[in-house]
Design a protein with these regions (language model features):
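ATP-dependent adenylation/nucleotidyltransferase module used to activate substrates
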Residues: 1-140
């Protein structure tokens, strides 16, 4: 039902793409369902594995969609010096990614179209939908 509404609507569909299995599977499923993906947004961590460039090129080649790469204005090592190592409980690293991606998405032109950001995560990560940054993305 949701997919059919998206197909008819005037939406800008943005896939937040980490290059991992969950976001890759989500992108594949959206395209197979006929959802028009307008942007694939990739946050460069500055510490990416060398193989990630090959994976991004493969995804672009297979989907025909260019991948938009965004970066935080402050170098990762500067953040590390200020705040210490990121924590799995959701420290500054997640906030850094969120702010950067959200700034890009809000800056997209699109007339009156709504923007939907798709974020792929596994079923055991459902708690992520209740975090403050996720609620901020939904305008609540």
């Amino acid at each position: 039902l949701l997919v059919s509404r998206l197909l008819r609507g005037n939406m800008t569909n943005i896939v937040s793409f980490s290059g991992g299995k969950d976001s890759t599977a989500m992108l594949h499923l959206l395209l197979n369902q006929g959802v028009q993906v307008d942007k694939v947004l990739y946050f460069e961590t500055e510490w990416d594995f060398p193989q990630m460039a090959d994976h991004l090129a493969l995804v672009t080649r297979k989907t025909g969609l260019p991948i938009v790469k965004v970066r935080y204005y402050r170098h990762f090592n500067e953040q590390l010096a200020c705040y210490g190592w990121p924590k799995s409980s959701g420290g500054w690293c997640a906030a850094r990614k969120h702010r950067t991606c959200l700034k890009y998405i809000r800056g997209l032109a699109g007339g009156n179209s709504d923007k939907i950001e798709y974020i792929g995560f596994s079923s055991d990560e459902v708690k992520r939908t209740h975090t403050k940054w996720m609620l901020d993305r939904n305008g609540k």
